[in-house]
Amino acid sequence: MQTPNNNGSTDSVLPPTSAGTTPPPPLQQSTPPPQQQQQQQWQQQQQWMAAMQQYPAAAMAMMQQQQMMMYPHPQYAPYNQAAYQQHPQFQYAAYQQQQQQHHQSQQQPRGGSGGDDVKTLWVGDLLHWMDETYLHTCFSHTNEVSSVKVIRNKQTCQSEGYGFVEFLSRSAAEEALQSFSGVTMPNAEQPFRLNWASFSTGEKRASENGPDLSIFVGDLAPDVSDAVLLETFAGRYPSVKGAKVVIDSNTGRSKGYGFVRFGDENERSRAMTEMNGAFCSSRQMRVGIATPKRAAAYGQQNGSQALTLAGGHGGNGSMSDGESNNSTIFVGGLDADVTEEDLMQPFSDFGEVVSVKIPVGKGCGFVQFANRQSAEEAIGNLNGTVIGKNTVRLSWGRSPNKQWRSDSGNQWNGGYSRGQGYNNGYANQDSNMYATAAAAVPGAS
């Protein structure tokens, strides 16, 4: 092991030897040949690893002392070259894509998912305290570490359990992969879990101008994180590019739903059928198409933004500006066997539901939320999903705070009017309605 001294150079320190044994001879002062130098470095690394396993407390103290000398500032400096120092934050989607391609590479021969220019390793099963400093220390003997990044949750700043180590050369990355895979991690009771990342961390993220191939995933358990959701889908569908669990900005907790972005339309279609009702953690997922136009980016900042809902058709009627506080949703195309309790379940994921009404024999229903934002989220995410046996179509319903008149004069719930016009369970609305719904999904950027 090499440790810095007061003069800025490094001294070689070997682990304690047992009594009666002859200590190893001191290192020669002359500079050894490169091949011998590499062999000596490798032997020192092995001795260091053995010492850490035999004397974990002393090894940790030495490691902490070394870290304090190298990085006195409480915030860890990134281990990288100038280019990385200018851009210390990596894009979320790019790393999520690397994460899914790691799962894909597990089913392929080593190196099959990358090319000869890939110099980045994926490191998984990280404990919560394992940060960039820890990973850099583990691989620093190669003297070729270019950058280190541990992926963290943007809301909690806690580690997601994986990260990336980029090397200066492909050969150095290969050596680290072969040497450390399965080796017990320093100061831990678990082995290194390594694999090739899909591409170098310095490459640009893919263009977001392609088709939107996202799905909505509801009924998520509270403990499901981005990484868990990603792993659930990426293990079966190699084209998965990212996953995002929507977090309540006020509580910091999951809202119980999220999005998964695909790169292949056929796989997305398969997932909507095969994964609907499948378990993720302790709950069965409810899967449907993600209707926001840019759901692949998991929404923009909080607030209302125009989007087009799938299946929108022109019709009669309009919504005046006075309806900006309307929180009632019309649900068309309902299965005749769906009860009000069945209808309430998927909508309750998005906020407090005030009332649910299903007029007899009309093939439709109404869901009223306590606030407009919850209704907007529900429309944006549930339109075109399956409830019961049918695919439903959502639009804004009649606000119960206005007295709507109809030819028949009949109303439901003091404000649900037949004047809305039922066409086999579908309400005739003007096309502008389908552009008024807004996604209120916290941004991933």
Curated annotation (Swiss-Prot):
Induction: Repressed by ozone-induced oxidative stress.
Compartments (UniProt record): Nucleus; Cytoplasmic granule
Biased composition (Polar residues): 1-12
InterPro entries in the record: Nucleotide-bd_a/b_plait_sf, RBD_domain_sf, RBM42_RBP45_47-like, RRM_dom
Keywords: mRNA processing, Nucleus, Repeat, RNA-binding
Region described as Disordered: spans on this chain: 1-45, 93-117
Record GO biological process: cellular response to heat; mRNA processing
SUPFAM superfamilies attached to this UniProt entry: RNA-binding domain, RBD
One Pfam family it belongs to: RRM_1
Tissue spec. comment: Expressed in leaves, stems, flowers, and seedlings.
GO cellular component: cytoplasmic stress granule; nucleus
Domain of life: Eukaryota
GO MF annotations in UniProt: mRNA binding; poly(A) binding
Chain intervals with Pro residues compositional bias: 22-35
Residue ranges of domain RRM in the record: 119-199, 213-292, 327-399
Bias (Low complexity) ranges: 36-45, 93-108
Assembly mode: Interacts with the poly(A) tail of mRNA in nucleus.
Family recorded in the similarity comment: Belongs to the polyadenylate-binding RBP47 family.
Function as written in the Swiss-Prot or TrEMBL entry: Heterogeneous nuclear ribonucleoprotein (hnRNP)-protein binding the poly(A) tail of mRNA and probably involved in some steps of pre-mRNA maturation.
Listed name of the protein: Polyadenylate-binding protein RBP47A
Organism of this sequence: Arabidopsis thaliana
